């Protein structure tokens, strides 16, 4: 019923896996675990270990960054079509441009001496490096925005990173909900920014309609994508129905107002539900 040709899957417990179904799933390579690489033995909030998935950790910053680069290149060769970062569940999305010296300090300290500032500097540095690597290997970078630990997880926290990495494609998942106005403030200024309506119609029908209305009026149709962001087949179909209802409601209103023709609306449906994703994830 969903009529999907391919599904981009995020197997966060086994990053970069196609879940054993390559005919259906194309992986995004989730990189959150690598933000724990400043010390051995750490696990994320889901109990997943970086070392158990990717082996022994390098013990210095330069080798660590190259190690991350190696894994990204390998996962791309295995079929990954995107990188993904969902660190908004763990921390702020305000990633500062820190120096190498600031970032590598954490490798020289005993675990008992490591501060939150040391961890932040390491993670900030790594995020900027990942943005550079994403451009080098031509993989879009999906960023979970909005919901999570909700302190500084709005889209504007990423403004400086997006501005200074013009060759990196930033796919902003969930459009920063509930702070969707942040998206409107910068989407027109960055050709490398792609709004993604994933999850949004389930979170808020009203917000999803508002976002689509405004993005259509801002001529962003060629950049919008949608995804279900669900676990099961039943949930995925329900998510698709919710999005169809929201999108059709928006297009009907735009046609009734004389803003769009029926052919314009059909073109928008094709782009959001198929064409745009095909151009981004190539």
Predicted segments with their positions:
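A gly/proline- and charged-residue-enriched helix-loop-helix capping module
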Residues: 35-64
